[in-house]
């Protein structure tokens, strides 16, 4: 495969490549010498389960494997005990060694649902970081300045707002960067929020007389709400170890707009096939629900197998039919709101009832369902993001969409 063909695959879904020309030269050299590039991506095992947000990087790693390159799946068992401060307004609570190792074992089991185990090198950064002396660590710290660290957006904001920044948090980008030195990485992948740390890796490789790694940043996958980064703490995630029915149902609940983003970042369909699907949806030849089912089947099959995917679809269709929810229904577009919104108000906004008070009475009488589930709490509040299917009585439906 030519350099141009490889670059077309590598660019898919990527936010930024630093530096693109440099990466092209590395691929050209790899093709001429037959020596594969070494691709690195690190994951701190701060929680036991991987979710679809993590798999954006894993899919890009698999693409590199398919192009014939070597992939290093780095488990940050050492850095996980420090806690990545990226995007945080306060110091993260450190994990114990026991917690980190327990989570790391589950990562090893889960990643091979995506990566080819025969082409994957699994490494733990404690192998080299755990052997560093105090002198080594001071030498590493000497490679940067406080001013440089404050260029990081989150550190800069905390400093400006007079919020504490621990010294060990300044060390995190340097330690992550040193991983690239230890592995002699040619390319490092990371989320857009990791760009600063990835560039520190380039700087440190120059210090250690290595060729600086190319950096590829990937977008942060939005969670089920379509607004926030997918996160277990926000409850808007899809875990790859969740039951097949649950994964299928969660994917069917996302907005049509978010579905197309999931196709681009999570599906094995080519970009041409995705564009064809978009056109078919625009022309009315393919209903969005059918497109979601296709995506849900693909993702469930990846983690649970084709039979489980078929069964999950049958189960979803059966539940959908039993609830008699129509595919077509009135849609009410509302501006996304911070906090929560009373269900009674949403019923009125959707035109299912004439007033908020009538909505509360309908809820009390057991005549209202949200996403197929009966609701009896007339003071129920729903997050002002994402989508909801509201049902009043047996025949009246409306879809609420927060944008």
UniProtKB/Swiss-Prot annotation:
Family: Belongs to the class-I aminoacyl-tRNA synthetase family. TyrS type 2 subfamily.
A cellular component annotation (GO) from this entry: cytosol
Source organism phylogeny: Bacteria, Pseudomonadati, Thermodesulfobacteriota, Desulfuromonadia, Geobacterales
Binding site for ATP: 232
Ranges for domain S4 RNA-binding: 341-402
Subunit structure: Homodimer.
Name under which the protein is recorded: Tyrosine--tRNA ligase
Reaction equations catalysed: tRNA(Tyr) + L-tyrosine + ATP = L-tyrosyl-tRNA(Tyr) + AMP + diphosphate + H(+)
Alphabetically ordered keywords of this record: Aminoacyl-tRNA synthetase, ATP-binding, Cytoplasm, Ligase, Nucleotide-binding, Protein biosynthesis, RNA-binding
Primary localization class, coarse: cytoplasm
Role noted for this protein: Catalyzes the attachment of tyrosine to tRNA(Tyr) in a two-step reaction: tyrosine is first activated by ATP to form Tyr-AMP and then transferred to the acceptor end of tRNA(Tyr).
């Amino acid at each position: 495969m030519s350099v141009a063909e490889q670059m077309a695959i590598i660019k898919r879904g990527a936010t930024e490549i630093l530096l693109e020309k440099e990466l092209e030269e590395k691929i050209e050299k790899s093709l001429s010498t037959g020596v594969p590039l070494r691709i690195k991506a690190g994951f701190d095992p701060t929680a036991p389960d991987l979710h679809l947000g993590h798999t954006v990087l894993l899919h890009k790693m698999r693409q590199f494997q398919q192009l014939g390159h070597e992939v290093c799946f780095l488990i940050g068992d050492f850095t996980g005990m420090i806690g990545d401060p990226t995007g945080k307004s306060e110091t993260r609570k450190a994990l114990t060694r026991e917690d980190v190792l327990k989570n790391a074992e589950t990562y090893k089991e889960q990643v091979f649902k995506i990566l080819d185990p025969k082409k994957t090198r699994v490494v733990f950064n404690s192998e080299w970081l755990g052997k560093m002396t105090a002198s080594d660590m001071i030498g590493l710290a000497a490679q940067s300045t406080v001013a440089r660290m404050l260029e990081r957006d989150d550190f800069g904001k905390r400093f400006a707002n007079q919020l504490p920044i621990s010294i060990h948090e300044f060390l995190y980008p340097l330690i992550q960067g040193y991983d690239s030195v230890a592995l002699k990485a040619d390319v490092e992948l990371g989320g857009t929020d990791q760009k600063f740390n990835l560039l520190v890796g380039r700087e440190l490789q120059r210090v250690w007389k290595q060729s600086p790694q190319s950096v590829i940043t990937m977008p942060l996958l939005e969670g089920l709400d379509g607004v926030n980064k997918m996160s277990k703490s926000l409850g808007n995630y899809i875990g790859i170890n969740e039951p097949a029915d649950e994964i299928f149902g969660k994917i069917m609940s996302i907005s049509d707009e978010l579905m197309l983003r999931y196709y681009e970042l999570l599906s094995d369909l080519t970009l041409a096939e995705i564009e064809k699907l978009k056109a078919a949806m625009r022309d009315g030849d393919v209903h969005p629900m059918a497109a979601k089912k296709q995506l849900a089947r693909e993702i469930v099959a990846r983690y649970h197998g084709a039979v489980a995917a078929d069964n999950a679809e049958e189960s979803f269709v059966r539940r959908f039919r039993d609830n008699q929810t129509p595919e077509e229904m009135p849609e009410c577009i509302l501006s996304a709101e911070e906090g929560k919104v009373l269900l009674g108000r949403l019923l009125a906004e959707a035109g299912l009832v004439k007033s908020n008070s009538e909505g509360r009475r309908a809820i009390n009488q057991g005549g209202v369902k949200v996403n197929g589930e009966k609701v009896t709490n007339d003071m129920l509040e729903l997050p002002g993001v994402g989508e909801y299917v509201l049902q009043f009585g047996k025949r009246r439906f409306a879809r609420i969409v927060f944008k």
